[in-house]
Amino acid sequence: GIDTPEGVAVLETFKHGILQNSFFISLYIPDRSLSFLRDFDAGNQALYPLLDALVAWLVKVHDQGVYHQDLNVGNILYRELPSSGFSFQLIDNNRMKFYSELSLKMRLKNLRRISDNVDLLNYILKRYAELLHLDTNKVQLQGCFYLMAFEAKQYAKRKLKHCLLKPIPQ
């Protein structure tokens, strides 16, 4: 299975029928967030063992049919193990879907949200492709395309929301 903190509650707030905030409340665990990877520096060689372990874990998550609808470095916790290596846990679990199998397209669309840091995303996509014995260039290109399409959609949604919530002059 996939490790997750034990859930206690889910809290969602809506405004005009639109989800504003969503909170997953779990028991405390001492693991740390991977959110520091948003500032990923490809020259920091010390991060590569963690990244390689993360990618192997992401392959395992996808192999088990888990599709986290908000898969990003802020929703993954990690712990360095004394015997060397790392363990990972997913949080924000109310945003998960489960399938019998994930296609490559679903996997790459899921990975597009892992980070908007292109260097980090490209490294993750490259290692992911290598572990699945796929063409790394093709996987990186598809993954970056899905990221750009996702960001364009998010931008359009923000602009539309801004227009809809803006008061109409009388």
Regions found by a protein language model. Name each.
Residues N44, Y48-V55:
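Conserved short alpha-helix within the protein kinase catalytic core
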Residues A9-V10, V73, S83, L141:
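Proline- and acidic/polar-enriched loop/turn elements at helix boundaries
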Residues Y78-G85:
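Activation-loop N-terminal segment of eukaryotic-like protein kinases
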Residues L71-Y78:
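Hydrophobic residue at the +6 position relative to the catalytic HRD Asp in the kinase catalytic loop
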Residues F86-L165:
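C-lobe/activation-segment region of protein kinase-like
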